[in-house]
Amino acid sequence: MCESHPVEPAPEEGHTRRSFLTRVALGASTVLVPGTLRGLLGAPAAAAAPPPPGTNYLNETAYRAAMHLHAAFSEVTGSLSGHISQAIANGVGIVVPTDHDWRIQLRHYGGQYHFSNWSEPTPSGYWSLLRRPGVGSLTTTSGATLVSGGAAPADQTAGAGALRLVACSTKSSIAKVAYEVDSQTSNADAKGTVLGRVLHIWVKADSTSNARTYLGVQLGLANDPGYGPKQITYRLRTDLTAPTQPTVTGGNAVIDVPVLRGQWFELVPELLADIAACWPSALPEDNSLNSMVLLAVGDKVTTVSGLFSYLHLETDPTYDPAAAYSSVLQHYRVANPGLLVPNGMEHSVDTHKCQLGGQQFFYAYPDTGDPSTHTSYGSAVAADLVAQIQAHDGVASYNHPFGIVTTSPPIGAKRTAALTAQMTAVLASKCHGADCMEVGYNSRGMDLAGHLELFDCLSANGAFLTATGVSDDHVGKDWLAQNNRFVTLPWMVGLTEEAFKTALRVGRASVGLLGNFTGSLDLSINRTAYMGQAYCRVPSAADQVVLDAYGLPSGATVSLYGGAVDFGGVGFQRPSKIADFGASSFALGSVSAPAVGSGPRYYRFTVQDSGGAVIAFTNPVWQIPPGSPVAVPANRFVP
């Protein structure tokens, strides 16, 4: 089973917790339910007037948390401003940014391209020159060639060359040739934050150029909630002798750079200053460098030709990753005081682990000596990493448990094999001691049903984790259009980081699919032990599982499941359905069903829409009779 968790700190002054929260904070050790507790029987709690929607019998409030969000320090186009904007638009009160740790650190970043070939080796793989869609109708003489020995004098590397681009249109309109320097097969190590890195590229214009026909370098930046994806095109112009003001249309900016025809010129964009000049309302530091595209744009009259050489990204030796990351988070905390934005980070070892809240830190990875495998370490390092997250007062999440593949989830025998393999792995590793697992997840190697079955396997084998729902969004726009748009719905005593971490550690959270369900769900045994907790009393025929649900969509069905804690490994007894309830059954907020069985068990429920698709689910509540061979974490134990 997974390891126990530390005791929660006392609630903030001014807040009260009922006996439920007092009882669960017993200590850091697990509690093996003793036979001496058999006399501590109590009748089911008396019925009480239902609380108003959004609150519960424990004086907790339901919140929405968007977790596992990648922004400008990661490898795609997300920005924290985009996530914040989407959170506000969708009524989400908790935003947990979790960029990759090694990308924030620029670990094994840098990189050079010498234009000696269409692909060049790097310490982590390969950078490549990839043709991108052009514009217009190009002549047959247009295109790209590598010029051996044609490198800029600054590149003294043996075999260094240059890329010649030629663009001429068959029509009066312009035509464009475009090639990207791509690092996808090198851990995407050219992509990431604009902070701490300086781009250099040498260019020689062999033809005249102007605002219409030119050589250019186009840099893709992060998404902006107001402008969409941003990009800056640096036009190299022989008709200018001095820089001009940028021209900006929405997310597209153009900066003209004077150059001399026939002479090498080193382009070194000052990205922070340029972003600030182009989009004054945006935070420049909340931007990433996502693409580097080399351009030649010509027309029928003017053939544009020129050379590109020695592209290299240098890491600033004064770059402070901790300060850089913290400053971006703090900017949005100050600007959005109504949101909770705790520290977060995805520590990206073999099995990625998110730190949710706590003090920011960077794990000291062992040096493998091989940059291409610098995130591959094994279970011992993963377990130590989780312990370090917890030592820094963070909640540790086991992320996308079926891996990082982005292909469609497997079906048939391949799906069964993937499930069996991962069940075996998490049982053997005890989830490395993590507090949570991403179960609300519908991609990366498995569908939602498979994630739920994996979590049932853990529950049936006596492992106490909290199931969360996440998006793993790297783009930061239009959350409702995403397939993987799960949010975690924690019950909290106030919108504070400590209350949030308590909910995650104790299992006081359900999961919903944003746009389909973001109400509130809870369940309990006799209104004594609630979702995430273990009811540790002698079973009684009068015991009831009580289901609370608010905000159910019309036509929804709630299905209650019960499963035995049988320690059956991957062959555990799958949970069985106890009852279905229509949405109208919850007119007063709750329904109940008899707690069946005599041995240790767990109960959870799902919400299906009118078409039968699961749109929400709860964490389990446990029924662990005295004398059961189940080690209950002290913070989940209810005598």
Predicted regions and their residues:
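C-terminal functional module detector
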Residues: 49-62, 70, 74, 80-84, ...
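Extracellular carbohydrate-recognition regions
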Residues: 113-145, 317-318
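Domain-core and long-helix interface of multi-subunit machines
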Residues: 27, 316, 345, 362, ...
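N-terminal secretory signal peptides
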Residues: 1-19, 28-34, 38-44
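Extracellular polysaccharide-targeting segments
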Residues: 295-327
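Extracellular beta-strand ligand-recognition surfaces/modules
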Residues: 201, 264-307
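Short carbohydrate-recognition loop motifs
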Residues: 145-178
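Extracellular ligand-binding interfaces
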Residues: 179-183, 192, 200-277
